[in-house]
Amino acid sequence: MSRDLPNVIILIGPTASGKTELAIEIAEYFKTHIHNIDSRQIYKSMDIGTAKPSKNQQKKIKHFLIDIEEPIHPINVKQFQGIAQKSIKSEIKQNNLPFLVGGSGLYMNSITKGFFVPDVPPQNDLRKQLEELGQKKCWDLLKNCDPLSTKKINFADHIRTIRALEVFYVTGKPLSTLKVQRAPDWRILELGLDRDNLKERILQRTKNMFSAGIIEETNYLISKYGFDLPILETIGYREAKDVLKNHSTIDKAIELTTTKTIQYAKRQKTWFRNKNNPLWLDNKNLLKDAIIKIESFLS
């Protein structure tokens, strides 16, 4: 690939692997900004449950693509793709080094690999009908019309199941038949972050979330946007809702959130290895290894 193309650095890794802290150190060293590639941190007022970079961290290093929309207005992959590519191109025009950080593989690859994403807006009436059917029935429907998608979507992932059905019913085409468009003209270095003690890190982060106030944050979101806000069905918020409804205890919520997050992290790592194949960083000295790899790439 031509060295005349704009350079773009990417840091990917599963949830709770420490991407935020490492990314800030890397951004400080290379005097650049961070483009946040996360499917939930794009929403305002969802700070604790998404482990969003703190206000102090955001003051230290400028973050793009955080708090860009209210949770009541979902941003699909197609919309995020356009917003993110515009932001990155703006950085390139200013001769800055775009630095993309995140754990949402689909969102990341839609930006860097040029995935075609159908521009299908939310179909509220259809969604209500599908939600009334329940996840098992929706899963069976998806298996009939788009069996390949059921191999990529977790059985318990209600949001992605409904989205796949939504795309099929609106376009008549399975979501799994999406094709890759021409990728952006960027020279990309992908770095991967993983941890040997990831399960312990996930447990600790989950405990921190509940002690920091995810239940109160969930209650605030419910009071502002309603109990049926779709994003509150995602990991952490769903369990906090159950506590608020007296259907669960905090200890059980922590246990279930931890289990679901570990399962999610496993799927993330599988995605990264199959779809991205990054240069994995040495856990013994992450920052030093990242700097060496980036400087070698840029030289």
UniProtKB/Swiss-Prot annotation:
Domain of life where this protein originates: Bacteria
Question: What are the recorded Gene Ontology BP terms?
Answer: tRNA modification
Q: Detail which positions bind ATP.
A: G13, P14, T15, A16, S17, G18, K19, T20
Its EC number(s): 2.5.1.75
Q: Which cofactor does it need?
A: Mg(2+)
Q: Name one GO molecular function term.
A: tRNA dimethylallyltransferase activity
Keywords, comma-separated and alphabetical:
ATP-binding, Magnesium, Nucleotide-binding, Transferase, tRNA processing
Member of which family?
Belongs to the IPP transferase family.
Please identify the protein, giving its name as recorded. tRNA dimethylallyltransferase
Annotated source species: Prochlorococcus marinus (strain AS9601)
Gene designation per UniProt: miaA
